């Protein structure tokens, strides 16, 4: 009986210690959105040279490196993601916010993630 109780206690402890990715209902992270080929799809145009798990990246957009140096003010980066046509009418980058391809919350998550690169 003690062995069974110890086994159950061990299983419960293991379940509680599982990382958030294994938990149902977990909200998407900025990286999830960036890597999502049907949502953000940032990988289609941008390279992510510091992320080994970023496979099959594009090269038509600037690489996502040194983002804090390039965008010291995160609001400028957010504005670019929301609608890059404001600063460059001929850009190929989709206006993710203007066209509601991403929600405000999703854009904030993407900005936080990309700014950390």
Report each predicted region and the residues it spans.
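Positively charged n-region of N-terminal signal peptides that target proteins for export
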Residues: 1-5
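Bacterial N-terminal signal peptides
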Residues: 7-17
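Electrostatic cytochrome c docking/interface patches
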Residues: 18-37
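Gly/Gly-Pro-rich "capping" loops immediately C-terminal to redox-active cysteine motifs
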Residues: 35, 47-82, 98
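Short pre-active-site segment immediately N-terminal to redox-active cysteine/selenocysteine motifs
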Residues: 37-41, 49, 106
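C-terminal capping alpha-helices of c-type cytochrome domains
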Residues: 80, 86, 98-117
């Amino acid at each position: 009986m003690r062995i069974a109780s110890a086994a159950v206690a061990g299983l419960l402890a293991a379940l509680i210690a599982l990382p958030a990715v294994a938990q149902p209902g977990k909200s998407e992270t900025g990286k999830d959105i960036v890597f999502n080929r049907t949502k953000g799809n940032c990988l289609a145009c941008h390279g992510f040279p510091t992320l080994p798990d970023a496979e099959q990246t594009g090269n038509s957009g600037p690489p996502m490196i040194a983002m804090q140096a390039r965008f010291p003010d995160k609001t400028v980066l957010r504005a670019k993601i929301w609608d890059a046509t404001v600063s460059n009418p001929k850009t190929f980058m989709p206006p993710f916010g203007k066209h509601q391809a991403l929600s405000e919350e999703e854009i904030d998550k993407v900005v936080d993630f990309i700014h950390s690169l």
